[in-house]
Curated annotation (Swiss-Prot):
GO terms for biological process: defense response to fungus; signal transduction. Disulfide bonds: none annotated. It comes from the Eukaryota. It catalyses: NAD(+) + H2O = ADP-D-ribose + nicotinamide + H(+). Residues 12-176 form the TIR domain. The keyword Repeat applies. This is Disease resistance protein RML1B. Disruption phenotype: No visible phenotype under normal growth conditions, but mutant plants are susceptible to the pathogen Leptosphaeria maculans. Keywords: ATP-binding, Hydrolase, Leucine-rich repeat, NAD, Nucleotide-binding, Plant defense, Repeat. The lineage of its organism: Eukaryota, Viridiplantae, Streptophyta, Embryophyta, Tracheophyta. LRR repeats lie at residues 539-562, 583-605, 606-628, 629-652, 654-675, 676-698, 699-724, 738-760, 761-782, 784-809.
């Protein structure tokens, strides 16, 4: 096993040096500490062979310098030894010069006695100093004062010495392992991954635990596992990283022989004994059952591998940890591994940082490469492997070379990336491979039930296939709040699927994707055959083509037809004959920019499940009634010439009807009343739509989008089961009765001036922004499920009534007439924004600020930190010196002003850092997204609450900054809170707890200057 010191950035010989007075602690506390440290693999300097003298010798000074941590055990007689005091001075010198970590244990003495050299400790100190010079006395006194201010363990406060010693050992291990090995320094997001996995590992638990790291190929599982190994291996007696297990299967062995072979390789590595030979499968248990081990099993893809190397937890000693990385979640279920960390894709911000770290060796784009970097990040789909490979290939390249790479990435998959991703695909059986390819080409981001219906008449086991693909991390089944499940495949996996099709022999292909090959077939009506089930091609990459009437005659089994345009240049490159014969078995017809005014009269939609004619030239689909029993989804969006919908009486299974941007559509036909399974209706942007049939009861209809239907004045009751109603930018004046409504959005509907007398109590989200509403009804407080309200730009709204306690978000920006709000605003953990509300009266401002004390956030105009914040400072930095009373949280107030040079439209972020005096750890950094600072007309107050996990009595420095420099920080302030008083005040519904604190001085907290007719701060 590698010693803990071997992983440090400096070569330390010992983990710990202990400074102590032998007669006080050697046979008691110190002996117990040594025993615990030995159990945990912590090496501590042993001073028993050193001869004590009047001064500490070179060997002891060297031992102090060669130790990563010094533990000072301050006992009653510690100061009676000049040796101990000289040790202490040397230790503090090493702390200052070398960054040595110093920990303290107060063993039977009060820290204040040590600090002031009083009591029995002071008597011993004075006796020692009586024989010394004043210079030595001052030197020792200063050292004792410094060490007493280092937070440590106070023996008198512990009821159980053993538990205290266990905690000390854990603290030592945490400090030894405070950061990963330098191999992973600067790796974006690695700390967050390690923090989550360490939580699952529960390292203080003596049970043996198996934890998995799961995710798709290229997500970074192995990298995370290696960083974890570097971070934790020194905590264990034995450790081993077993890599590339995927390639460990040898066909020359039977199952027993394979497991035996794998165990031999494993034990040879973990025990550092090359060429081990074993004769039975109990060898791991025989060798490791009494050892605390850390084992990483990387890239596991067979259950046999787990059965061979970690079949039972009893094979390993107490406290052992086994970490498995895999793409196969089903394998984890089969082996009974329930503790799994699922590696997710990085955020947009982190993905850009990852790319830049490889392309520029920094975390942000070089000047002039900002847009190109964002384009590459998007094309890589935020997959860390893709960002790494592509970023490295771009290092040192010029802008025009970057542009070439961006163009190539749109259609071509890098070979190194393909090699990694293809492994998972090739491990699938034929059924799963077929389904994978169909999803990659036709059904990415489609509804799961819809896809199952697509294959209802085939032999393909879609339900089982989807489960396999999800378990292998090749797709993700994304579940939405309304219960819908969509199939999501990563963009690079899609490209890999296309490459897999291109590598097939022409006569083997069930799916055609080569645009030139397909156009040749359609133009000359020859080639292909019975086995072709799908066709998908990009018409933006071809010249003009005229399709023959019998083009699909040789493809009788064609079920999936997709014609799309990756670049919409407005040109119609395809010419379709009026009487073209579509395949009669079509289940998917997805044709973007269809060039004809209608579908051919011979078109038979009997088997059709989805009809998608986005941006078509259609004026109508067909005449008369058609058999539509299988149709579940119809999308005619952006068909600007569409004047009428067909008779939909037979579409009794239709669930989704999308008509966005159908600008010529005037009326929804009455046949829609037969669509009893319709769940969603979307007519956004139908600017000429005037009529929606009345007297309908579409019992399945839950979501209705009517935004931008500027001529629509009346909305009938379409269903009493509507949950989500969006009627933005319309001419409507009222809302139909929907007793189960959850979301109501009438933003931008200027004719809408009043709410229903009784809003449904089921409402969770309400958007009234940019309406002429003047009053909100008193029933508002009874909406106990309401979570979010948007009143932005309601310029006539003068007051806010009592709000429900369930409210989490209230946006009232630019409410120019708003003066009063109901007091108090007792809403726990709520975020309130009153940007540019310059008419707020004194009581309203007081209520808004007070609300933030309930673990909330607030934004409102202001030039100075209000007097209620008892710690205030000019500029961006604030130091707080706790008064000794326990606190659990702070409320911060920051005065910001928009940087006039900023022209960004992306909401900037406020970064704040907590730095504790003499703390060896890293500062705590927290990002707070602060909204549209670029819209603030003057200075504003940003108020937010933050909890601390533990009380600390040392000085704390808080620093606030804007990484993007989009705003300036004028002032900052903070108020220390005790959790009990906040909780009691919230539960009582009063503001009594703040009466003494929230005393606003108008001359200080509120300015008297005028901004036009508005009082500003």
């Amino acid at each position: 096993m590698a010693s803990p010191s071997s992983f440090s950035s400096q070569n330390y010989k010992f983990n710990v040096f202990a400074s102590f007075h032998g007669p006080d602690v050697r046979k008691t506390l110190l002996s117990h500490i040594r025993l615990q440290f030995n159990r945990n693999g912590i090496t501590m300097f042993d001073d028993q062979k050193i001869v004590r003298s009047a001064t500490i010798g070179p060997s002891l000074v060297e031992a102090i310098k060669e130790s990563r941590i010094s533990i000072v055990i301050l006992s009653k007689k510690y100061a009676s030894s000049s040796w101990c005091l000289d040790e202490l001075v040397e230790i503090l010198e090493c702390k200052k010069a070398m960054g040595q970590i110093v920990m303290t244990i107060f063993y039977g003495v009060d820290p204040s006695d040590v600090r002031k050299q009083i009591g029995k400790f002071g008597i011993a100190f004075n006796e020692t100093c009586a024989r010394k010079t004043e210079e030595e006395r001052q030197k020792w006194s200063k050292a004792l004062n410094q060490v007493s201010n280092i937070a440590g363990e106070d023996f008198l406060r512990w009821d159980n010495e053993a538990i205290m010693i266990e905690k000390i050992a854990r603290d030592v291990l945490d400090k030894l392992n405070a950061t990963p090995s330098r191999d992973f320094d600067g790796m974006v997001g690695i700390e967050a991954h390690l923090r989550e996995i360490k939580s699952l590992l529960d390292l203080d638990n003596v049970e043996v635990k198996i934890v998995a790291i799961a995710g798709p190929a290229g997500i970074g599982k192995t990298t995370i596992a290696r960083a974890l190994y570097g971070l934790l291996s020194k905590r264990f007696q034995l450790s081993c990283f077993v890599d590339n297990l995927r390639g460990s299967y040898h066909s020359g062995f039977d199952e027993y022989g394979f497991k035996l072979h794998l165990q031999e390789q494993f034990l040879s590595k973990v025990l550092n004994q090359s060429g081990m030979r074993i004769c039975h499968l109990g060898a791991i248990k025989e060798n490791l059952s009494d050892q605390r081990v850390l084992i990483i099993l990387d890239d596991v893809n067979k259950l046999k591998q787990l059965e061979a190397l970690a079949n039972e937890t009893t094979w390993f000693g107490p406290g052992s940890r086994i970490v498995v990385t895999t793409e196969n979640k089903e394998l984890l279920q089969q082996h009974g591994i329930n503790n799994t960390y699922h590696v997710g894709f990085p955020s947009d911000e982190d993905a850009l940082k990852i790319l830049c770290s490889y392309a520029f060796k920094q975390t942000s784009p070089r000047h002039g490469f900002e847009e190109l970097s964002e384009s590459v990040t998007k094309l890589c789909g935020k997959l860390p492997l893709g960002l790494c490979v592509v970023g490295s290939s771009l290092r040192g390249k010029k802008e025009d070379e970057w542009e070439d790479v961006v163009t190539r990435l749109e259609t071509i998959l890098d070979q190194d990336i393909e090699d990694v991703l293809r492994v998972g695909y090739e491990s699938l059986d034929e059924n799963a491979q077929t389904l994978f390819l169909h999803i990659a080409i036709f059904f990415n981001k489609e509804d799961g039930d819809l896809v199952k219906t697509m294959f209802a008449e085939s032999d393909l086991d879609v339900k089982y296939g989807l489960k396999i693909l999800e378990n292998r991390s090749l797709i993700k089944m994304k579940i939405f709040s309304n219960g819908d499940t969509k199939i999501v495949m990563h963009r690079l996996l899609q490209q890999m699927g296309k490459r897999a099709i291109q590598k097939q022999e022409p006569w083997e292909r069930q799916i055609l994707i080569d645009a030139r090959e397909i156009c040749h077939v359609l133009e000359h009506a020859k080639g292909t055959g019975w086995n072709v089930h799908g066709m998908s091609f990009d018409i933006s990459r071809i010249s003009e083509v005229s399709i023959r009437k019998k083009a699909f005659k040789r493809m009788p089994n064609l079920q999936f037809l997709k014609v799309y345009k990756s670049k919409d240049d407005g040109n119609n490159r395809m010419h379709v004959p009026e009487e073209m014969d579509f395949p009669c078995l079509l289940r998917l017809l997805d044709w973007k920019a269809y060039p004809s005014k209608s579908l051919p009269p011979t078109f038979n939609p009997e088997h059709l499940v989805e009809l998608n004619m986005h941006s078509s030239q259609l004026e109508y689909l067909w005449q008369g009634t058609q058999p539509l029993k299988n149709l579940k989804k119809m999308d005619l969006s952006q068909s600007k010439n569409l004047k009428q919908l067909p008779d939909l009486s037979n579409a009794t299974n239709l669930e989704y009807l999308y008509l966005m941007g159908c600008e010529s559509l005037i009326e929804i036909p009455s046949s829609i009343s037969h669509l009893h399974k319709l769940e969603m209706l979307a007519t956004v942007g139908c600017i000429n739509l005037e009529v929606i049939p009345a007297h309908m009861n579409l019992e399945s209809l839950q979501t209705v989008y009517l935004g931008g239907c500027s001529r629509l004045r009346n909305i009938p009751v379409m269903s009493t089961n509507i949950r989500y109603l969006f009627i933005t930018n319309t001419a409507v004046e009222g809302v139909p009765l929907c007793p189960g409504l959850k979301t109501l959005d009438v933003s931008g509907s200027r004719n809408f001036k009043g709410l229903l007398t009784h809003l449904p109590t089921s409402l969770t989200t309400l958007n009234l922004c940019y309406t002429d509403i003047e009053r909100i009804p008193d029933c508002f407080k009874s909406l106990h499920q309401l979570k979010g309200v948007n009143l932005r730009g309601c310029r006539r709204l003068a007051s806010l009534p009592e709000l429900p306690r369930s409210l989490l978000t209230l946006v009232a920006d630019d409410c120019e007439s708003l003066e009063t709000v109901f007091c108090p605003l007792n809403t726990l953990k709520a975020s309130f924004s009153f940007a540019n509300c310059f008419k707020l009266d004194r009581e309203a401002r007081r209520a808004i600020i007070q609300q933030s004390f309930f673990m909330g956030k607030a934004v409102l105009p202001g030039r100075e930190v209000p007097a209620v914040f008892d710690h205030r400072a000019k500029g961006y930095s604030l130091t707080i010196r706790p008064d000794g009373n326990p606190y659990t949280s702070f409320v911060f107030c920051v005065v910001v002003s928009r940087n006039q040079k900023s022209d960004k439209t992306i909401p900037p972020s406020l970064l704040w850092r907590r730095i504790i005096a003499q703390d060896e750890g890293y500062p705590v950094e927290v990002w707070n997204r602060i909204g549209d600072v670029f819209k603030y007309r003057t200075e504003h107050l940003l108020i937010f609450h933050f909890d601390f996990l533990e009380f600390d009595n040392r000085d704390i420095v808080f620093e606030f900054s804007s990484e993007s420099h989009d705003f300036d920080i004028i002032e900052c302030g903070a108020k220390v809170l005790a959790e009990k008083s906040i909780k009691e005040s919230y539960e009582s519904g009063s503001d009594q707890a703040f009466e003494d604190d929230v005393v606003f001085e108008p001359s200080k907290a509120f300015g008297d200057e005028k901004y036009g007719d508005c009082c500003i701060l």
